[in-house]
Amino acid sequence: MRRHWLLVGACGWVLLILMFVSKFINFSFRIPGDYAGRSEIFVWTLSSVTTKLPSVVWPEKGASQPYILSSVSPSVVEPIDWHLVNEKRLEQLSTVCSNSSIWNLTHTTVRKFVLDRIFVCDKHKILFCQTPKVGNTQWKKVLIVLNGKFSKVEAIPENLVHDHERNGLPRLSSMTDTEIHQRLNSYFKFFIVRDPFERLISAFKDKFVKNPRFEPWYKHDIAPAIVRKYRRSHHDDSESVGLRFEDFVRYLGDKTGRQHLDRQFGDHIIHWLTYAELCAPCDISYNVVGHHETLELDAPYILKSAGIAGLVSYPSIPPGITRYNRTKVERYFSGISQRDIRRLYARYQGDFSLFDYPKPAFLLN
């Protein structure tokens, strides 16, 4: 009898302890949001074991990546299934492509110019469309290895990557119409995009400021031509001052006036053409659209989706190098008139919409 009452008493103490603990255990944490400090709050409680979770948390401007809570430990944040991310991107692409109000900004005839941008790996049935200033050099290295020119990406000389006579990467334009259609209809196709305005900044820095590959025609031919037509004050010596970003913005936003210069510049304009003009995403059915801002997660997904994950690795990506930098964008656009920025946005509006990059209201308003 005594043992019975001791057991009842012990059970009572356990119940009291559980009731007391359940009132105080309520775990909550934040997942980092966009660069402006917005965040999503997720709550997990011991009593109900429920998760307050949107299907995908999309940070503004692609500054980070979508997240879910870990199925193993609710206190751990991990990326969502990247297949769902890609499906969402393709759905967005399809929706915008069918929007007749911006049809002229999103559709391009699949002509030789576009086919020149697409590199072919017949061995593994892959097509890669080149969109400059989004890490294309590394993807070219991956294809060079797959084509058997080198055994690993680290062994490829930098000067060879862009030498299209020697790098072993055939362009789709070099093939017959029958071969082109067969590959477009059956091969794995992908390309990479980036916030349109940040990409323009990267192109400006790479070609007109740093010019690391020593391509003198950008500074000696293209820059002076833009300065002569678009610099509002000619008191400065154009040769010594060089091209300014505001000159570059005026040139890009001049819908009709730039056409003569574009013809004069030839294929060098690929570094600032729209993604629609380069890869015809509304007219070619791509399997994957990668984003520069989430390249750490996109790269392995692309390798896996193309069936080559065990054959080659994407070169390591320095932490944070692909992250969207709003401060840099604001700095470059400071001092540029609202009219010029709006004209620039009007040209790249199709790219912003196709790939779900938010309208840069902080620049336009």
From Swiss-Prot:
Cytoplasmic topology ranges: 1-6
Regions crossing the membrane: 7-27
Keyword Iron-sulfur among UniProt keywords: no
Topology feature Lumenal, residues: 28-356
Molecular function in Gene Ontology: sulfotransferase activity
Bilayer topology: Single-pass type II membrane protein
Biological process annotations from GO: carbohydrate biosynthetic process; proteoglycan biosynthetic process
Binding, 3'-phosphoadenylyl sulfate: 132-138, 194-202
EC number: 2.8.2.-
Carbohydrate-modified residues: 99, 104, 325
Major localization listed first in the record, in broad terms: Golgi
InterPro entries noted in UniProt: Carb_sulfotrans_8-10, Sulfotransferase
Family per record: Belongs to the sulfotransferase 2 family.
Its biological purpose: Catalyzes the transfer of sulfate to position 3 of terminal glucuronic acid of both protein- and lipid-linked oligosaccharides. Participates in biosynthesis of HNK-1 carbohydrate structure, a sulfated glucuronyl-lactosaminyl residue carried by many neural recognition molecules.
Annotated protein name in UniProt: Carbohydrate sulfotransferase 10
Organism name: Danio rerio
Gene: chst10
